[in-house]
Amino acid sequence: MTMPLRGLGPPDDTGVREVSTGDDHHYAMWDAAYVLGALSAADRREFEAHLAGCPECRGAVTELCGVPALLSQLDRDEVAAISESAPTVVASGLSPELLPSLLAAVHRRRRRTRLITWVASSAAAAVLAIGVLVGVQGHSAAPQRAAVSALPMAQVGTQLLASTVSISGEPWGTFINLRCVCLAPPYASHDTLAMVVVGRDGSQTRLATWLAEPGHTATPAGSISTPVDQIAAVQVVAADTGQVLLQRSL
């Protein structure tokens, strides 16, 4: 059985419905008109009743269901160009070149749409980058943390640890950073240490804890709201007992 040529509307007296469809029923030419919404209400109900029992017409409608979406993406100029380039549709059916022309036009339109979207996205990204750059520059204009020298800490309860401490005053308090190396032999136990800030009022605040691993340098850091001039000392202590091992008095 040969596939029918699909028409644009229901059969009429112009001879269009005389085209052979292979199954010789007059509904074979109604599929395109149904998909495009060109049938009258009565014809639409009649065709839908026919579809319930005709797999041929159901398949034809399925094949054409994407055409309205394709047509909706064409502008007036593209439709005019297709009309000029496509051969005239005669009573024997639609030209086989029409659908490829539609698809090519839609492809060009989508390509332009993707290009416009890409340009718009790039422009938005550029604006965002400029905003971030301005924000970073504005932030960098704020006072920077002054370089702070690393001060050695005195060994108090051990000779197996050595450390330096850097103390930086900030508008919000104090930032403290240690570089603590464990000098114990490889077979020594890995003790847990803690950094403690001693205030001039006698308060003690634990800022960080870490594991002392022989031969390795730990870099614990912490912040505290206490101003630098209110800090009496920074200590490294045994986390479990509180024994002072290293200390830097201020």
From Swiss-Prot:
It is a single-pass membrane protein. It comes from the Bacteria. Binds 1 Zn(2+) ion per subunit. Changing C54S: Loss of Zn(2+)-binding. One of its GO terms (cellular component) is plasma membrane. Its cofactor is Zn(2+). InterPro entries: Anti-sigma-K/W_factor (IPR051474), Anti_sigma_zinc_sf (IPR041916), Znf_put (IPR027383). PANTHER family: ANTI-SIGMA-K FACTOR RSKA. This is Anti-sigma-L factor RslA. The gene is rslA.
